[in-house]
Structure formats: structure tokens, C-alpha cells
Amino acid sequence: MKKFLFFSMMVCLLAFVSFGCKPDNAATNAGNKPAQTTAASFAEITDSEKRKVVLAKKPERVVVMVPSILNYVDAVGGTIIGRPSSSKASVIPPSMEKAEDIGHVFNINMEKVVGLKPDLVFINAAQHQKFIKMLETNNINAITLQPKTYEETKEALVITGKVYGKAAEAEKLNKAMDDKIAATVAKMPKEHKKRIVILHATPSTVTVELDNSIAGNAAKMLGFVNIAQGTTAIQGKPEKAPYSIEVLVEKDPEIIFITSMGAQDKIEKRLKADVQGNPAYSALTAVKNNKVYILPEDLFLTPPGLRYPDAVELMAKDVFPENFK
């Protein structure tokens, strides 16, 4: 019995010395904090394509391929080393004008991007998905963002805030947008349920926009009823559906919104050929009541970002100007 007791005590003593701590406190260190076997990551992010991106440390060399995301970065006080060229529909924030120009959003110079040695690149899922493998091969993190709806816009801002360690600032900005949109919605006639259609014109075609487009989402928040909702979307363009004058006549929208992309003279020619030149168009309620509105590209073609409340308010003012005096 004594030998057994002595043996047991020796085992406990050896175990205590080996681990350097009490058996019931094996996960604490000298500072009385849990011991960490691996370094904690700076941030774990799930992007718009549901890809999980782990950032080991705060990014210091960020390249942005998406013009609209520049405003998100600027809003949270972030910095960049590379950005796309400016265009009529996308203005570069003053604080980012000196960043390296990596080419147009549809024609990114990937050699220049890799040469900048970034530790993170923001990309657009639609245009830049093909670059992910190249970036990862060069040990460059890629985060895809493609915000069109308001909820996607807020989520993109949250992600941008996490990247720059400014999560609280991002939440404040989202709250401010929520408040502005709520104020606009409060001025709308109660349960008006006006029927609308959103035509999207380019020099080559006319389509209609669904609720998951920028204009469609803004219209939905304002209580408009999109006559195209429920229509099968065009393959590869989930926010658009085919245009049909027959459906337009059948549904007879009370309001017509028009978004466009391209040279104005060519767009007007296309609208006249496909829409306005048809005698049935003149008989539509929206046309007879002069309720046809052209929506600006800077708010409804490229994602408006933090200007989403402006897009919603503009649409509301177009239709109900008397409510915003």
C-alpha cells in the first residue's frame, strides 16, 4: 500500500513539473490568459460569392478593381495603392486619385496589379472571377464584392469595415443610410401600389429590370409594383428579363422608368425602334399621363454605394414631387 501511494505521488509530481501548472488550470499562462497555440487571424470574411477569406493581419497594400468600392473604402478611412480608371459614371474620390491606375474595370492590367505586390484585392464577381486563381497563386487575397441591392450594399460596407479594422464606423454609416431611406419612405402615399416598369436601353437592345436590379430594388422599397417581377431572367443577367411590347400593353404600367448604358444618340435610336415607334406604346397609361422618367447613370447604372438613399429619394421625388416640397 505504501509503495503504491509513493508511486502515485511520484507520477503526480512528474506531471506537475512537466506541464508547469496545476492540473485544473492547464489552459492558463503566467498572465492568467488562455494559451494560444496559433496566432489569431485579423479577420475572417465571407464575400459575395460565399468564399471564406482569412486575413492573417490587417492589409496594408490594397488594390481595388471595382470603381464603386472606392467610395466604401474612402468612407471608412481606408487607403489603397491601386484603382481602376475613372469614367463618366464612376468618379475617383480625391484621396485616391494618386493611387496607381490599373486600367478600365473591363480591361484590368493584371501584370501591373501583381507588380504592385498587394496583400489584398477587391474584385467584381462578374468581371474578375477569372483572376482569382492568378491572385491566389501569387499569395494575394481576393475578396469579391458585387453590391446591387440595398442589403448587398450594406453587407459590402460591413466587409470593407472589417478589412480596415473599422467595423464600428461601417455600422454607423449603414445606420445613417437606413435613417435617410426611412425618412423618404415615410413621405410616400400609404399603400399606393402603383404599377411600374423599368426599361434598360443600350445601343443594341432593350430589356426590363427586375427587383434585384438597382432601380428595381429602390422601387420595391418605395412600394411600387414592378410588372416584370416573376418573369424569367435572362441567362447570365439575373437582374434583367426580355422586353415585350405585348406584355407592356397587357400589364399597362402607370409609370415608366428608363435606365441606359452607352451613347445617348444611339440609345434614343434604339428606344424609338423597339419601344416608342410602336403605336401601342402611345396608348400606355404612363405615356398618356406623361409619367416616363429617365434615371441617371451615376445612381442607377453603377452601384450607388453610400448614395443609395439619394437614388431612392430621386425616384420618389420623380413620381410624387408634391410630397417633397
Feature-to-residue mapping (PLM):
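Short helix-initiation/N-cap motifs at beta->coil->alpha
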Residues: S48-K50, E100-E111, A233-I245
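A short, structured surface patch at a secondary-structure boundary
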Residues: V66-L116, L120-A125, I227
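Alpha-helical, coiled-coil/dimerization segments enriched in small aliphatic residues
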Residues: S87-S90, V208-E239
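Flexible loop/hinge segments that line or gate small-molecule binding clefts
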Residues: I92-S95, Q127-V163, Y293
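Structured C-terminal subdomain patch of bacterial secreted/periplasmic proteins
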Residues: K154-E155, K162, E171, A182-V185, ...
